[in-house]
Structure formats: structure tokens, C-alpha cells
Amino acid sequence: MIKIGNIELSSNVILAPMSDVTDLEFRKLVKRFGAGLVVSEMIASRAMIMKSRQSMQKCAIMHDDPTSACVQLAGCEPDVIAEAAKMNEDMGAKIIDLNFGCPAKKVVGGYAGSALMRDEQLAAKIFEATVKAVKIPVTVKMRIGWDDNTRNAPTLAKIAANSGVQMVTVHGRTRCQFYSGNANWDFIRTVKEAVKIPVIANGDITNFAKAKEALQRSGADGIMVGRGVYGKPWLISQIAYYLKTGKEKPAPSIAEQLDIITKHYDAIIDYYGKSVGVPIARKHIIWYSNGLPSSAEFRCTVNLMKDPIAVKEKIAEFYMSVMDANK
């Protein structure tokens, strides 16, 4: 089983950090479906040390489980990232993850995210400063490189490991690919061969078969699932079961899905409040209902609704209609 420092994961299937997706309530939900580790949304380190409302909300964690208390930080200033890491440790974080993989122009333009892969000396300073600042494990998530001519993930992983970083996750694309083409799981094997710390494969892992193939081709210790869980938080459980038994675990029934989405919806409203919670919940409602009969009409209706009680009633009405149609 994977160990990050002295923290042992119960599963080698991990939830990826995703901006505006992996908030506290979504992480709680996916953790209940058996994720070995759940990671917060990316948090800008400078905003963190300034204690902006948004950054403080993003770093909220579950204190009862160290594998639910992993906070991802982004930035390019070693001292600022180190200070933000220490702040999170003081607030209860058990793992700090460093973002060296985000390809977004806004992030890269600030010389953070995957832009850091272009400056190995700066990367080393960030690793060293962060590891020195905290007593908890530090991990990093990166891409295979900036472009096809600079696929330096193996080198950067070595620098990270030599600096005391305890786990490396690699998304199998370059920054210049963004999310186009296919994830190069084979290249991740070169990272695995370069270091002795755990290596996690990420990218295009959307079902059982791809999860198994990613592990086999990469030789990685585990996999990280991202966009595949949109509307399917139970996918983590299905993948873990398949990797363990070789058997496919069915998705929840429509009735069970209604229960999941209703509880998730209630949690969002309780956490964010009505005015903020409803817009946040809408994107999850869209993902949950995708592919169900008459879901397009349902989504159009919900997107125009603002009253939280009315939205909840509409969710129940829609899922009941799907169940009736299946009788």
C-alpha cells in the first residue's frame, strides 16, 4: 500500500485536485466512496498568506482523517509557498501538495503551475523551502514536461525526491498539450524508474479498463482520477473494486443516485448558503444528470432556478420520472 511519509493510504485510487470542483463537500463525498486520498482545490499561496476569504474556504479540511487533509498550493515564490504551507499545517493539514502541473494561461502567466517545470533551479528552491517549513509530508503534481522537446518530469522528480518530497503525481501530457491528445502513460514509467518514492499516474482515467491500463503501462504505485468523477463520485469506488477483484461493480441505481445527489445538494447549500450554494450546485446537477432521459430539458430548467427549495423539488421530480420510465 502507498505510504506518504508516515501516512498510509487505504487505497491506491486518489481524487485529483480540481479548481471549482474539489471543495470540502465534494471531497467528503468522494472520500465516502473509498478514495485513498482526496486533495483540495489549488490555492494561490500569496492569497493564502493574506487570508483571503476564498483561499480560506478552499483550504477547509476534514480533521478526523489525514488522507482527507491534503491541501494543494500554487505559486512561484519559495518563501511565500513555505509560509502558506506552514499556515495550513497549523490549521490541521496533514499533507501539502505543490502544483507544478496546472496548464491554465492565468496560472502559467504568473510563472506558477506547469511553468515551474521550465526552471529546475527555482523548482528545487520551492521544494527545499516547503519541506523545511513543515513537519508534515510534501508531495508534488506535475506534467511530463512543458512541451515535447522538454519532457523533464524524470529529472524534476529526482530533484523533488532529493529535496525531501514524499510522492510525485504525473499527468501524462505536456503543458502545451493542455488536455488534447492522449495521456502518455508509458512516459510516466520513466519517472517511476527515476525515483524511489511513490509515483501516481494521472490523465484520461475515466473507467475501469483505463485505470488498469494506466497502472500497467506506467508501472505507477497508484492512479489519480480527475474529470472522470464529474457526476460520478462513485467511480472511485468502482475503480478500486475492479483493480482489487477484476470484477466490475455496478453504478448506483437511479434511486441511489437520487439519494446521493440530494445529500450532496443539501451539503452544498448548508456550507455555502442559499445565494452562493445554488449556482455551485447547478454544475454538479448538470454532471449528475448527463446521459439520463430528458436531461437536457431538466438542465435548462434548473439553470434558470434560484430558489433552493424549488431546485431540490425539481431534482426529485426529475429522478422520479426517470425511475417511473424504467418500470
From Swiss-Prot:
Top-rank lineage group of the source organism: Bacteria
Record bears the keyword Cell wall biogenesis/degradation: no
InterPro entries hit by this protein: Aldolase_TIM, DUS-like_FMN-bd, DUS_fam, DusB-like, tRNA-dHydroUridine_Synthase_C, tRNA_hU_synthase_CS
Catalytic residue positions: C102
UniProt KW keywords: Flavoprotein, FMN, NADP, Oxidoreductase, RNA-binding, tRNA processing, tRNA-binding
Pfam families: Dus
Reactions performed catalytically: a 5,6-dihydrouridine in tRNA + NAD(+) = a uridine in tRNA + NADH + H(+); a 5,6-dihydrouridine in tRNA + NADP(+) = a uridine in tRNA + NADPH + H(+)
Cofactors required: FMN
Xref: Gene3D superfamilies: Aldolase class I (3.20.20.70), Putative flavin oxidoreducatase, domain 2 (1.10.1200.80)
EC numbers on record: 1.3.1.-
Residues reported in the UniProt entry to bind FMN: P17, M18, S19, Q72, K141, N202, G203, D204, G226, R227
Record GO terms (molecular function): flavin adenine dinucleotide binding; tRNA binding; tRNA dihydrouridine synthase activity
Family recorded in the similarity comment: Belongs to the Dus family.
Cited function: Catalyzes the synthesis of 5,6-dihydrouridine (D), a modified base found in the D-loop of most tRNAs, via the reduction of the C5-C6 double bond in target uridines.
Protein name: Probable tRNA-dihydrouridine synthase
